[in-house]
């Protein structure tokens, strides 16, 4: 491909709306264009990367015994009603009606449709096990689409579904998919950690996520370098601490004027935040007030709280609601003289803490040296604290590491979560009708483009890994008016094509500095610079990844690059 004819136009200005490096660089390098919030066009170079990513995924899925098909984007309401998810999936589900008033959704995932397909086809145990997969566009009405391809409303996903006769067979399918995913991410050259995860809206018995480390991911991973434990931070259990042994001091009421935050209170009273009780009022289902109590040095993990409450329909109480329900202001909510209609949840972190600082439900006043048993009685203990660096590993007790990451893959052992309500049964060897045991396995294909850029970039631009780069080689002609250079560049370009290298020839009539800047920005793995060294019978080969440069004889240049490319793909 000649760059002068290729639909690749870089931007010189920094995209103002972009926060994540992948969002900024994909826009600036001319790989994507935004149509609307969370909706992006993939331009030719991005589409080339996408197709190479899909090829790697297909190869490993086919190798695992999975079979590719293509389901529909439009899913009828009736299928989703069978599982109850038409109502419970939430506002992320795009819903629409046709001209006859029949309701559909744009598939965010395809458990209902694939289960319906299999129940119409599979009758006997002889037809099982089977694993079916597709690479298909999905839609989710994200509340806050952000970071470009990281959190989009329209995206491409690989979703697979396994169907088995029993739990043992289902676990074999699950492990096969787990192994396939590990091979996929290894071949994509992505640094990915497999972590235990919550089953969430999909449901089921077991779940693992495959998370690529990046500062702009929406997931937090806690992992142990000692025993290898890894899990999404929202499911890491934090047990009750041991009861403190210090002597209980007399409770006192102290004046704390204009002190509104834990940090301010800690400084004012000269106490560590861990000695302060923090109280946060939530409104559940727009009617039920729930007061969550937690140690002052901890934060509430609202994903954990969602599981405790059994609903995601909750929010922080407004200033007006705090005043109406408790007669006080935020920052001064305490545990004394609470109305009977207030449900109180105690985070494990408060267990056994002595000489606490507790608000009075009275602005500008606190109690100090408040102690359990003597001054108050505990209520229901729950685990709603965010895990943090240094918390104990639930497996071995060693300090945990915590990093942000981007979920690229998610696998679920579903059991009969969908087959039972949808009556997807088969006749077993004993002649009895039984529900099919299912699993589902997703990979965010378009999101992988963002993850690759997140992990492979520098201050100059993208550094695509060779196996998925839009082009493996960029031949840069420094002077389009120099016939000798031009002839050498043309010869190298044709030779590269003949030898199967995915090559782009920068034949544009631009300055060398302009071409080098573009080459750095778009990030092709190798470049051959055709310049003044041609008179010595040489060209310069450069590696975008390492910055290495080699002066190579013109006749050997393409073979030299081809060898480098083959090494990268091993």
Curated annotation (Swiss-Prot):
GO molecular function list: aminoacyl-tRNA deacylase activity; ATP binding; proline-tRNA ligase activity
Subcellular locations according to the entry: Cytoplasm
Record GO biological process: prolyl-tRNA aminoacylation
GO cellular component terms, semicolon-separated: cytosol
Reaction catalysis annotation: tRNA(Pro) + L-proline + ATP = L-prolyl-tRNA(Pro) + AMP + diphosphate
Protein EC: 6.1.1.15
Top-level EC class as recorded in UniProt: ligase
Oligomeric and partner information: Homodimer.
Domain comment quoted from the record: Consists of three domains: the N-terminal catalytic domain, the editing domain and the C-terminal anticodon-binding domain.
Function, as annotated: Catalyzes the attachment of proline to tRNA(Pro) in a two-step reaction: proline is first activated by ATP to form Pro-AMP and then transferred to the acceptor end of tRNA(Pro). As ProRS can inadvertently accommodate and process non-cognate amino acids such as alanine and cysteine, to avoid such errors it has two additional distinct editing activities against alanine. One activity is designated as 'pretransfer' editing and involves the tRNA(Pro)-independent hydrolysis of activated Ala-AMP.
Protein's name in the database: Proline--tRNA ligase
Provenance organism: Aquifex aeolicus (strain VF5)
């Amino acid at each position: 491909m000649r760059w002068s004819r290729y639909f690749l136009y870089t931007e010189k200005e920094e995209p103002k709306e972009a926060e994540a490096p992948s969002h900024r660089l994909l826009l600036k390098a001319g790989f994507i264009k935004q149509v609307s919030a969370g909706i992006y066009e993939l331009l030719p170079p991005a589409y080339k990367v996408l197709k190479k990513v899909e090829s790697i995924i297909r190869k490993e899925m086919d190798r695992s015994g999975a079979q590719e098909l293509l389901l529909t984007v439009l899913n009828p309401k009736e299928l989703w009603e069978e599982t109850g998810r038409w109502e419970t999936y939430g506002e992320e589900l795009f819903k629409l009606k046709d001209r006859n008033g029949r309701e559909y959704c744009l598939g965010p995932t395809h458990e209902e449709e694939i289960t319906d397909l299999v129940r119409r086809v599979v009758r006997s145990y002889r037809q099982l096990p089977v694993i079916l997969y597709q690479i298909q566009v999905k839609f989710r009405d994200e509340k806050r689409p952000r970071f470009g391809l990281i959190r989009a409303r329209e995206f491409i996903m690989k979703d697979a579904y396994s169907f088995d006769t029993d739990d043992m067979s289902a676990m074999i399918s699950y492990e096969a998919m787990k192994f396939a995913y590990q091979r996929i991410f290894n071949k994509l050259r992505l640094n990915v950690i497999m972590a235990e995860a919550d089953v969430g809206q999909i449901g089921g018995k077991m779940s693992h996520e495959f998370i690529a480390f990046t500062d702009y991911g929406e997931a937090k991973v806690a992992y142990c370098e000692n025993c290898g434990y890894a899990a999404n931070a929202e499911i890491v259990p934090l047990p009750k601490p041991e009861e403190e042994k210090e002597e209980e001091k007399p409770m006192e009421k102290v004046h704390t004027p204009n002190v509104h935050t834990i940090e301010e209170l800690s400084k004012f009273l000269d106490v560590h935040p861990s000695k302060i009780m923090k109280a946060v009022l939530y409104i559940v289902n727009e009617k039920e007030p729930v007061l969550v109590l937690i140690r002052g040095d901890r934060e509430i993990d609202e994903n954990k709280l969602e599981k405790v409450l059994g609903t995601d329909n909750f929010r922080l109480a407004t200033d007006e609601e705090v005043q109406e329900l408790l007669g006080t202001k935020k920052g001064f909510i305490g545990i004394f003289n609470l109305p009977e209609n207030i449900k109180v949840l105690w985070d494990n972190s408060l267990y056994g803490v002595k000489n606490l600082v507790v608000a009075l439900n009275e602005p500008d006043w606190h109690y100090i040296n408040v102690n359990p048993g003597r001054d108050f009685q505990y209520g229901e203990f729950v685990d709603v604290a965010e895990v943090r660096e240094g918390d104990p590993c639930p497996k071995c007790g060693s300090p945990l590491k915590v990093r942000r990451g981007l979920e690229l893959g998610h696998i679920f052992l579903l059991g009969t979560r969908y087959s039972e309500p949808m009556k997807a049964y088969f006749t077993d060897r004993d002649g009895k009708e039984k529900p099919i045991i299912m699993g589902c396995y997703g990979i965010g294909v378009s999101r992988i483009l963002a993850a690759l850029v997140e992990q492979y970039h520098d201050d100059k631009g993208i550094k695509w890994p060779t196996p998925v780069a839009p082009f493996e080689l960029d031949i840069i002609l420094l002077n389009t008016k120099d016939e000798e250079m031009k002839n050498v560049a043309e010869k190298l370009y044709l030779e590269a094509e003949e030898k199967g290298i995915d090559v782009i020839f920068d034949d544009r009539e631009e300055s060398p500095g302009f071409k080098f800047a573009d080459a750095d920005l778009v990030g092709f793995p190798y470049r051959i610079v055709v310049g003044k060294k041609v008179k010595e019978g040489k060209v310069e080969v450069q590696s975008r990844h390492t910055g290495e440069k080699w002066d190579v004889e013109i006749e050997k240049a393409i073979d030299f690059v081809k060898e480098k490319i083959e090494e990268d793909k091993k």
